């Protein structure tokens, strides 16, 4: 419930394959029946007037892979992470690839990821998500040259095979980035269009070509082809073209079939037509049904989450609400809960538990910088992330306090050191708290404390065995909390005698159900 809406939800197990239903509204003084097109005070006999669910097709059921809701993701920007064990060179590099130059900026490699799997797993991650790793021109690897090989600045195909195998041996999953909305300037098909103009057999692979197609050196010159945003070096692909669809669907199959990856994160997914995504889903799921598909969608994403396109999306709304409440402290607990409730109620339950909940990524400012380097605010946000419904995603280095408001800063090289900083120890405790308590992954969510003009927020996560209660005191004043019949799992600033929380304190309780 919030200022504007009451929210209701029911899980119905029906023995009937056809269901007709209506809503009964009762405020204690008046009862109305709602049939969609009209209200009435009496029951309607004509079932054609009812809401109807004529048949539940398996293909229409949103069913993300079962492993997803238990996952804790560690998101790695490969160029920035590691060259070796607890080390990154910070040095730029250039490599030749089929006559083209690929570039690295900070020296990160796949070998560096392999040699730091102990660190990632000990932190509490059960899955790694790698930003683009295929051969591409620039350090970020979003300007693709070759979709079938690892960028030489990052290593070899065999390095990647070893990474996947090593992760699987540890019980960890691997998700990679799929960039199909656009390619690089020197991608073979676009290069053919530039060289052969209207005679190119790939001219229909791209949008809005004006011949002759040229690569403008001046960044202020608008190109004679459609591109990603205003990035002239990233021509936009025509994913409505069956040839383009089949090419990229085979890419999707290839990395699952040959390297056994566990998922695709799909770049700028909302800019690509649904027909392509449905074909891509079918291609990938035929190879490995448990391969997760996560779309990059910045807005509300119900459209893509009905079981026929994606299993999950990057939940930037989660970040936005956490920013307002924890980092900026610009909204109170009641408003935060209203926004979180609205976000939760948009999605079907299986999808809600598979949403990728991030505080930051390679595209946005570091959350620690939004907290103005205040570890207390950061810690409360992280604890909420690890105890909320959905898959928590940690961007590399967040646990080490990497700071950055601009792109050059928030893709900063990993700050390796021998000792874990205090923030990293907090991350480790919070991530392990989640993985050790199934109620935090699969349990129901219920708000128990969220008042106006107050920063105290409380909620419960409950499964068939355990109830976990969390209180976050996101304010500069101490706060009393309701008595809880349970034992403390973790606390900071909790005074049991007075049942109160210190400013910016928290308490996590557990009790058997």
Task: Tell me the role of every PLM-derived stretch.
Residues 1-72, 77, 83, 89-91, ...:
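Carbohydrate-interacting/catalytic domains
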Residues 72-74, 128-130, 174-176, 264, ...:
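Hydrophobic faces of well-ordered beta-strands that scaffold small-molecule active sites
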Residues 79, 306-308, 312, 353-360, ...:
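Aromatic/acidic polysaccharide-binding cleft in carbohydrate-active enzymes
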Residues 141-150, 230-232, 316-321, 407-415, ...:
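Short glycine/proline- and charge-enriched loop/turn segments
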Residues 164-172, 182, 187, 191-198, ...:
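Active-site-proximal helices and loops of the catalytic beta/alpha 8
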